[in-house]
Amino acid sequence: MFKNKDSVGGTLLVIILLSLACSIIVAGSAVLLKPTQIEQKELDKQKNILSVAGLLQPTTKNSEIKTIYANNIEARLVDLNTGDFAPAQPGFDAAKAVKNPAESTALSAEDDVAGIRVRANFAEVYLVKNDAGQVTQVVLPFYGKGLWSMMYGFMSVQPDGNTVNGITYYDQGETPGLGGEIENPKWQAQFPGKKLYTADNQVGLYVGKGASANAEHGIDAISGSTLTSNGVNNSFKFWLGQKGFGPFLAKLKAGVLNNG
């Protein structure tokens, strides 16, 4: 068609063909890699759940995580409107649910203290069991807006529904060395043993300057990270409140695990 390979038309044809070939390669690679990416995402989630539950050792290999998870963790779906366990929904994904109006609830400005705008109607919680099959901890997912990013984490709670076993943040984009220190194990080490609620059942857990003086509820803030700390506090207020896991945790206190 183009006898002169150096012509403009010939050059354009070569560019078009190369672009088409590259597009096919990229698209094919994305399809081939997707199962691996999904598997890695699930492995990372399991690793973080086991970590906050204290079931990972420094020597634990990735190849061992699935087995440890399967032997110790039971995922259960919770209806956030009632706090009751719900029938399993295979393939449930909270991130997809919030994009579906039929599976989520839009939050009013008053309710949306965590800055998430929409909340899925259901959430997965993770029951941590010992060798006898008894529940020793419950791991709750939570997230909320920080200074620069949405901050995602897990909190492990004792079966009394009021005592923190541990906390971890696994995905956040706060300022390195400042708000980003919410991922620092030294900061997270303040949480075990803290109480979620006050005597009158208000959310008591909070982060603030010098807050550790409150032995029951307070966590010292990271220096220079006031807005990130505010975001952490707002996450606690929402997810431990009535629009979050509050109804479920109330039933946990009442012994729902013995009947669920």
From Swiss-Prot:
Main location: membrane
Catalysed reactions listed for this entry: a ubiquinone + n Na(+)(in) + NADH + H(+) = a ubiquinol + n Na(+)(out) + NAD(+)
Spans through the membrane: 12-32
Keywords assigned by UniProt, alphabetized: Cell inner membrane, Cell membrane, Flavoprotein, FMN, Ion transport, Membrane, NAD, Phosphoprotein, Sodium, Sodium transport, Translocase, Transmembrane, Transmembrane helix, Transport, Ubiquinone
Coiled coil: none
UniProt-listed GO biological process terms: sodium ion transport
SMART domains: FMN_bind
EC number(s) per entry: 7.2.1.1
Membrane topology: Single-pass membrane protein
Signal peptide start-end: none
Domain of life: Bacteria
GO MF assignments: FMN binding; oxidoreductase activity, acting on NAD(P)H, quinone or similar compound as acceptor
Cofactor(s) recorded in Swiss-Prot or TrEMBL: FMN
Subcellular location: Cell inner membrane
Post-translational modification FMN phosphoryl threonine, affected residues: 226
Alphabetized Pfam families for the sequence: FMN_bind (PF04205)
Cellular component, GO annotation: plasma membrane
PANTHER family hit by this protein: NA(+)-TRANSLOCATING NADH-QUINONE REDUCTASE SUBUNIT C
Binding partners and assembly: Composed of six subunits; NqrA, NqrB, NqrC, NqrD, NqrE and NqrF.
Record family assignment: Belongs to the NqrC family.
Function: NQR complex catalyzes the reduction of ubiquinone-1 to ubiquinol by two successive reactions, coupled with the transport of Na(+) ions from the cytoplasm to the periplasm. NqrA to NqrE are probably involved in the second step, the conversion of ubisemiquinone to ubiquinol.
Protein name according to UniProt: Na(+)-translocating NADH-quinone reductase subunit C
Naturally occurring in which organism (per UniProt): Pasteurella multocida (strain Pm70)
Gene that this polypeptide is encoded by: nqrC
